[in-house]
Amino acid sequence: MHVTHLSLADFRSYARVEVPLDPGVTAFVGPNGQGKTNLVEAVGYLATLGSHRVSSDAPLVRMGAERAIIRAQVRQDERRQLVELELNPGKANRARINRSSQVRPRDVLGIVRTVLFAPEDLALIKGDPGERRRFLDELITARSPRMAGVRSDYERVLKQRNTLLKTAALARRHGGRSMDLSTLDVWDQHLARAGAELLAQRLDLIAALQPLADKAYEQLAPGGGPIALEYKPSAPGEAHTRDALYEQLMAALAEARKQEIERGVTLVGPQRDELLLKLGQLPAKGYASHGESWSYALALRLASYDLLRAEGNEPVLVLDDVFAELDTRRRERLAELVAPGEQVLVTAAVDDDVPGVLAGTRYTVSEGTVERV
């Protein structure tokens, strides 16, 4: 699969831009702040319905514009598709496939798939647990786009349940009459049902990712491993099947109910779980050096790419200003590993930041203009 044409309107710094794209390597080169990352950010948005740089859509819309449009022509084997997203901050986003009538934005998931390497990837190792949960859940959705709906359902139920718990906590704190919490039983069931499906997918993903990540780390840092991915659930137990995970979550919710009512928040579930990344016998966070942390983060991304490729539709590889962050050895090794990709999009401030093995199409990006060299 590869993107053959990218069109943006009022996205970030671009009033309008059209960029033809080839298979193989394409590099966007230009000084920082000129808009090169905006291009690959748009491709990534089509794949995840989110940005790797900001948490909301508002910064993605050009100043003074009401909405932004991302449009891409995609080719997979002999099949061609046109996918379009309209970003409307404060309102519902819109989507179209092949200029048809409007579809839900999440219906476009799976048409474009990406694996993104970026300076922010260090947060996978050094950041808080939310960074690692996001990594898992975005990859789960790339493997199975229907999981976007499951994640949305879980977040909706969690929000409703937290509202109920907060109201109960405030009532108790101010000496008010005790609330009828019978509806909490219903929310527990909904939360456990969606949570169990999400947990089952996370556990399956980790099992599939572990050998690939260990292999990738050895390729990047020979003799530096092994590495291990260990899931730490907030609901104690050893369950792996969806039904067993449902029962495990229900038991944990029952056990935590008194404390949850006191604190006014849900204390167990996927939103509280942790992915522990180990280097040797120690947690990478706090123990891995800067170079080891980079190798670990790159290994996770390479493993993601290998997994998606093995399961069918090869993703677009996006390397956003990542080579400037790496020492010479890691830079050369990473370039060798990604060079055979069906489509590889690279951004760099200067030509020298693009390894020679990644020779291909070049664009210069300056002051909002994108020109092929």
Swiss-Prot record:
Subcellular location: Cytoplasm
GO CC annotations on file: cytoplasm
InterPro entries tied to this protein: DNA-binding_RecF, DNA-binding_RecF_CS, P-loop_NTPase, RecF/RecN/SMC_N, RecF_2
Domain of life: Bacteria
GO BP, sorted A to Z: DNA replication; DNA synthesis involved in DNA repair; double-strand break repair; SOS response
Molecular functions per Gene Ontology: ATP binding; single-stranded DNA binding
Pfam family, one: SMC_N
Keywords: ATP-binding, Cytoplasm, DNA damage, DNA repair, DNA replication, DNA-binding, Nucleotide-binding, SOS response
Residues where ATP binds: G30, P31, N32, G33, Q34, G35, K36, T37
Family the entry assigns: Belongs to the RecF family.
UniProt function note: The RecF protein is involved in DNA metabolism; it is required for DNA replication and normal SOS inducibility. RecF binds preferentially to single-stranded, linear DNA. It also seems to bind ATP.
Protein name as annotated: DNA replication and repair protein RecF
Gene: recF
